[in-house]
Design a protein with these regions (language model features):
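Active-site rim helix/loop that mediates acceptor-substrate recognition in acyltransferases
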Residues: 25-46, 58
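Conserved GNAT acetyl-CoA-binding A-motif
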Residues: 96, 103-115
Length: 144
């Protein structure tokens, strides 16, 4: 079962997110997600197996330029995670579908995402669910 997350879901959402982004703390994620959930142009979806939360997806609208698109806003998959024992069963595809449906209700005609160059599993997922590679970039930073 997939459902849109609410404020009451922050603790479980943050725990799942820390599996995807292990450099973050649950408390930090709760705070960040509370701010994001309050915005009308962002949404989280949770996947359940019976009563157990097994995955989540974070999506939002991007109004700035999104590589490979020519419309605005663009729905954007910011993150997606499914617990190990539930992968390869279509859960991530269902989460993505919920995000895409949400983006359509917000007036989007395009949906985008990204992944790190060395994340082969994520790249394969994106290709398997219909994304097309738009570009590869290298990001730079510089201390001032």
């Amino acid at each position: 079962m997939i459902r849109k997350a609410e404020i009451k879901d922050l603790p479980i959402l943050a725990e799942l997110a820390c599996q995807l982004w292990p450099d973050h703390m649950v408390e930090e994620m709760c705070s960040e997600f509370a701010e994001i959930l309050a915005k009308p142009d962002a949404a989280y979806f949770l996947a359940y197996a019976e009563e157990t939360a097994i995955g989540f997806a974070q999506c939002q609208l991007r109004h700035d330029y999104v590589e490979g698109t020519d419309s605005s806003p663009v729905g954007y998959l910011e993150g997606i995670y499914v617990a190990d024992g539930y992968r390869k069963q279509g859960v991530a595809k269902e989460l993505l579908s919920a995000c895409e449906s949400w983006a359509k209700t917000k007036g989007c005609t395009e949906f985008a995402s990204d992944c790190e160059l060395d994340n082969v599993q994520s790249l394969q997922f994106h290709l398997n669910v219909g994304f097309e590679e738009a570009n590869r970039i290298i990001c730079f930073t510089k201390k001032l």
